[in-house]
Amino acid sequence: MLTPILVSSIFILAVVVLCFAKPNAGRIFLGIFFLVMALGVNGSFTFGNPQAYMDYASGALIPFYRTITVNIISISPFLFGLLLMAFEITMGLLLLHKHKSVKIGLLGTMLFLAGMAPLDWVQLPWLGLIVAEIHLLKHDFDRSLWETIRPGSKKGLSNA
């Protein structure tokens, strides 16, 4: 268990540093990260083994939280997975947009991270991303990813 926590912690620290050093690049990274996690991790659970959500919820650290998550997921693990994927995709796309959309995406992903933390010790380091997201909330991102990378763009990834 120590190795996944250590690897997660190093990754999270790198993302936090990126978000503080290059807020726009950090915000774009987080948006892409949530899209990849939605399609990769939750996509594989949802379409490969939706019962894994039940197994995960059954191991929640807090008994009350365990009861709530198991009761919700047990209704339909597959539907839960689809809804989780839809949420993560939506948040990822909001992070890649601009202005108020980014702020909504940041708040949504903060809630998501806080909701994941009580499920397992391995999830606790991910709360560190909230530090980066609070910092990103202070910025107004006036360009979407598309506007940042398209040819003829005046500003690139290096600008906040």
What positions do the PLM features span?
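Extended, low-polarity transmembrane helix blocks
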Residues: M1-A160
